[in-house]
Amino acid sequence: SNIVLTAGAGQRMKVPARNRVEVRFPARTLSAGTARFQVGAVSGLWADAAQFELSVYTPATTEAFAVYGTVDDGALAQPVIAPTKVYTQFGGLEISTSSTALQALTDAVLYLTAYKFECSEQLASRILAIAALRDVLSAFNAPGLPPEKDLVAAVERDIAKLQGMQNSDGGFPIWRKGRESWPFHTIHVAHALVRAQEKGFAVPDEMLAAALNYLRRIESHYPKSYSADVRNTLTAYSLYVRALLDDRDLDRARRLVGEVGVENFRMDALGWLLAVLAPSSTPEGPQIQRFLANRVVETAGMANFTTGYREEDGYLLLASNRRTDGIILDALLAVEPQSDLIPKLVRGLLAHRTAGRWGNTQENVFILLALDRYFNTYEAQTPEFVARVWLGEQYVAEYTFVGRTTEYRTTVIPMSYLAQKAGAQ
């Protein structure tokens, strides 16, 4: 069983006296599992028989190829050619469709809302997360989250805590009012306040104005120990937040690019500067876009950027590769929303989650901010459509999407069917 003898099931031969002959029967298996044999031999008046079985394993090597794309309307044609010289019992064409690229972001928000430490950066990150995903989570009715009124109350409580921590210079310390104001923490808190205000949360005007004044003088607040790389990155972040506050300093952004050179910035800084420069007609914006396009690591389905920083600078910037991807994704959505890199960056970020979230507060916040912009750019309209799949003239599947869901719909066409036709299908 589970075997086909391709040259017949019987043979006749002569066996010399006191000798032996090897008899071979060409065969092929039907499927993985077990192949069972019964063998009989007859010579004159004598006969004998035996029974045995052999394990049949899947092929030792496999190969997969994926193509990803986005369809807004109309149809998409993708030629398919079945590979030759393969085991048709294995593999096939798998087609997956979804009405959204955002897959269950609840865990990332829960991680931030339940975070047990409350320094100024962590409070700001919690505000940013809730503000950023307010539209997305309400649209998808995300399970597991506290009621919206509890999340709103948490943001209001965190804003009040931060207001109580703000120093007289407008800056924010790490833990307690009266301690040294830290440039990064101050920029990050100001970022949280403006994002919260954009989403309809109440932010004290005097609190935001004092933080903005600190940002305008940010370079005078850098300790002498800060490296040039740290200073340039923090200045870029402050310019980005000022732009969100309608205080865009285009001249300083251009001078910064001219002083440092595009190739000498950290990727994070380039993402922030791109968002500041792109609305203008200055040449620096396209220069940054070209540089980023030449530094992306791209596969058929995903994309990411890699960056590095000195270990001694890490705690001053709280940097990571995933955060960099989120920052650049947000910038590309703002300046080049039709870029083919955007859906790839989204898939790459979603694929790098562990237990539904990213590695730390900074990664979660900047990625969630970018995904919020992605949602409002590409998925603001509630899905209501039918997706149909054809292979050549053969109807394959139909998927109906009504309302928001993060589910995938998948159909598999076996290799045995694909191999029946040569050439493109």
Spans of features found by a protein language model:
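Extended, solvent-exposed functional surface patches
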Residues: 22-24, 31-229, 235-254, 272-275, ...
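Long, domain-scale non-catalytic interaction/scaffolding regions in large secretory-pathway
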Residues: 2-23, 27-52, 60, 77-86, ...
